[in-house]
């Protein structure tokens, strides 16, 4: 289903299990592991040294300053600096957000041991550790594609057009300037669109360190990947360390 280690810039994953996720489980926000990327180009550090100890302590302490679903920090040891960025989904409760990040902290250390650069995604959150300064910057290198194994019935081109239209509408909602910064749903949007007898549900989000302008650029970049990711599929998502979208033919966000 998922590979155990990935170090490529663009990752395509067919998530077969999406076909079997029940609507109720989706609304309960299951904290499913999605995928990770070990960024081997940033090198590795020696195990059990002061760098690793400082990083673990830093991750533990960051869970206590989770005020609005987004955290970032900088630290280092042995003349090396690391940057940490983590964010929860805009509809995740504080308890689910905290639980997801605890899981991400341990998961990323286990799946990418000693990597200086690494990213891990779960359904409710993601975590990014890098020696490259990433704050306020759009990541154009690392993408994760997930899609439902089932194709839509009927006109695929029309469905793709309707999906893009919903995502475009949600993008405008996510970057609205009247939003209050430093709130859990800042630069986050969710909505639905009627497609005859069915409904299409969508969600978009940027990391809260981005400016509204950069959020717009990032969302445009992942919407442009819709044909490559999810052509005619009943559901799909593009994940990136700076922004994300998801759509399904069933409700999956918390109202």
UniProtKB/Swiss-Prot annotation:
Localisation per UniProt entry: Secreted
Disulfide pattern: none
Pfam families in the record: Stress-antifung (PF01657)
Domain Gnk2-homologous: 33-134, 140-252
Cellular component terms (Gene Ontology): extracellular region
InterPro entries named among the record's database cross-references: CRR_secretory_protein (IPR050581), GNK2 (IPR002902), GNK2_sf (IPR038408)
Top-level taxon in the UniProt lineage: Eukaryota
UniProt signal peptide: 1-26
Keywords linked to the UniProt accession: Repeat, Secreted, Signal
Main location: secreted
PANTHER family reported for this sequence: CYSTEINE-RICH REPEAT SECRETORY PROTEIN 29-RELATED, CYSTEINE-RICH REPEAT SECRETORY PROTEIN 38-RELATED
Family: Belongs to the cysteine-rich repeat secretory protein family.
The protein's name: Putative cysteine-rich repeat secretory protein 10
Gene designation: CRRSP10
